[in-house]
Amino acid sequence: MGDQKLTGRVTIPTDIDVVPETLELMKRWGADAIRDCDGTDYPEGLKDVAAKVYSTYYTTRKDNEWAKANPDEIQQCYIMTKFYTAESDKLSIHLMTGIYPEMLKVNSHDDIRRWWEVIDRTTGEVVSCDNWSYSEETGDVTIDPATPFHDYTVSFLAYIMWDPVHMYNAVVNDWKDVEHQITFDVRQPKTHKFSMERLRKFCKANPHVNVIRYTTFFHQFTLVFDELAREKYVDWYGYSASVSPYILDQFEKEVGYKFRPEYIIDQGYFNNQYRIPSKEFKDFQAFQRREVAKLAKEMVDITHEEGKEAMMFLGDHWIGTEPFMDEFKTIGLDAPRHRDAGLCRVKCAEQLQQAPSCGPYPRLRRRRYS
């Protein structure tokens, strides 16, 4: 190929304080695209650059004004307490023990008798709703009567008050005085309408952007932090944060049977990759993939109508958009014409972002996600 200069399939992440370095790296590496990142701003000096401009786009966060005005449509997840052994005929369990308090908030707004579940883990039996109560004041569930020396757990819904990815980035990068981004639910009626209008406004307000880089769509994989802001439980394929009474009501209508929290909780294993999934959990996954793909296609269609390309980041809020499942190809994204090759650019950008410093070119962030 001689001295022919090759370019393409490399995306450079940037920020307002590294414009010269970005241009130099583009030249050295033959990059053909530039993008911003979570926690950065796209530089004015690169808006007319001779490359495609990608914009990270967050469908479920970065608008706390909306989230706070519509608390009933904040995203939710299922949480299970640890196992507690009854030492007498009465047992109290504090729901938020071992969980970072600024990340989650117990959802006692919706019918707790319908959407929570207390289980005697020694026998596997569900404790009757008549035999337990919840105190808003203490945050405790009290089981009365309990069977002495039996183990009990409580499965409950919680609002996601700090987006897990934003929290990770803030903690790892030691961001100071950053408002916690609340995760809102695009699946629900008011937020759905708002989100489609928000996307159109963004496209029109950013004519320099060629590609909307969705990060990702609607539901975060399972990522929960403990009371010290450490990762408590992580499952890149976990569905426990893709739930709400609104979604679960729809699921029940489709499958024709009543939903149980245990379909998600799975004795505390949360249906991780080492478990054999139940029929009910596979039904739930299939339902989620269909609904997520349908809604994602709506956003991709708007992107195309506004004259831009649509690309998906593989990770973060990707639940229901798994590229190895059949529903993915119905979304209509531009990049992934081939399942693997189409996503190479995205992962390459992530790897460059995490690379160690190279001479005068500093690593932009220690960020792992987004």
Give the location of each predicted region.
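Glycan-processing catalytic domains of CAZymes
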Residues: 1-370
